[in-house]
């Protein structure tokens, strides 16, 4: 379980990114967070693995505080958290296989991984992960030779090879076309269902949130204004999240035909 206890984030310029967030996400959930740009979605997501440090409160993972964790303890906790970015975050000149093996770095010494000395078991896991997202044939291609959708699937394979217990996906389909968007989200959903990996995804599209989430969390101005099951997320609720009906109506356009 991931638990946010009175979590707030204030940036150096005084902007409040998060305001007294109290939230529990159970193991195996597929949670989609929605809200306008600047609502606090990325800040909340990235605070889980401390890519963004909070200024108040505490974040617990399986009863252990990642907020207070240091050194080896922090590295161990981060090893269980896979991160998927909008920009893919791949080493473009490296092969797909090497990018996926980067998910194993936290399990070995720096020297060993720098020299690329991964055991046979890691290689097998990397190949299995690529097969899982239907991109095994690209294992020896350079990452920059792949389409955007293929690169994002490499990112998912990296999280699988990492054997992550939690996957955080920050706007993973924002730069993708509708068909590729469906493929990437289908992969994330199937992995969540098959392996029970807790998955938190930030999305702008209300239609996609309704299609894939088991639970939707709406943020507005750094605060949670909605937290409920998909069937509870009515148009009226989304109007509250997005602040005005015109914006809501635009976002309600079907993203995947």
Swiss-Prot record:
Ranges for domain ABC transporter: 2-246
Keywords tagged on the record: ATP-binding, Cell membrane, Membrane, Nucleotide-binding, Phosphonate transport, Translocase, Transport
SMART domains recorded: AAA
Catalytic activity: phosphonate(out) + ATP + H2O = phosphonate(in) + ADP + phosphate + H(+)
E.C. number(s) listed in UniProt: 7.3.2.2
Top EC group: translocase
Keyword Electron transport: no
Function according to Swiss-Prot or TrEMBL: Part of the ABC transporter complex PhnCDE involved in phosphonates import. Responsible for energy coupling to the transport system.
Subunit structure: The complex is composed of two ATP-binding proteins (PhnC), two transmembrane proteins (PhnE) and a solute-binding protein (PhnD).
Protein name: Phosphonates import ATP-binding protein PhnC
Species the sequence originates in: Bacillus cereus (strain ZK / E33L)
Gene name linked to the record: phnC
């Amino acid at each position: 379980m991931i638990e946010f206890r009175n979590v707030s984030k204030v940036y150096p310029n005084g902007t409040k990114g998060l305001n007294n967030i109290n939230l529990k996400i159970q193991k195996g959930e597929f949670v989609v967070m929605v809200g306008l740009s600047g609502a606090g979605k990325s800040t909340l997501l990235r605070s889980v693995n401390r890519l963004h440090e909070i200024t108040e409160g505490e974040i617990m993972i399986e009863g252990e505080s990642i907020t207070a964790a240091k050194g080896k303890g922090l590295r161990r906790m981060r090893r269980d958290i896979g991160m998927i970015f909008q920009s893919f975050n791949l080493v473009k000149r490296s092969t797909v296989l090497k990018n996926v093996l980067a998910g194993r770095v936290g399990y070995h010494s720096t020297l060993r991984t720098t020299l690329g000395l991964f055991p046979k078991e890691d290689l097998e896991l990397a190949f299995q992960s690529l097969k899982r997202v239907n991109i095994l044939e690209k294992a020896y291609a350079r990452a920059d030779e792949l389409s955007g959708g293929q690169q994002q699937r490499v990112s998912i394979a990296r999280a699988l090879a990492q054997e992550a217990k939690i996957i955080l996906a920050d706007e993973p389909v924002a730069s993708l076309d509708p068909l590729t968007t469906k493929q990437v989200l289908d992969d994330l959903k199937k992995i969540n269902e098959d392996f029970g990996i807790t998955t938190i995804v930030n999305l702008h599209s209300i239609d996609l949130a309704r299609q894939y989430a088991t639970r939707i969390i709406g943020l507005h101005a750094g605060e949670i204004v909605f937290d409920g099951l998909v069937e509870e997320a009515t148009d009226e609720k989304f109007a509250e999240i997005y602040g005005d009906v015109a914006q809501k109506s635009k976002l309600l356009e079907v993203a995947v035909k």
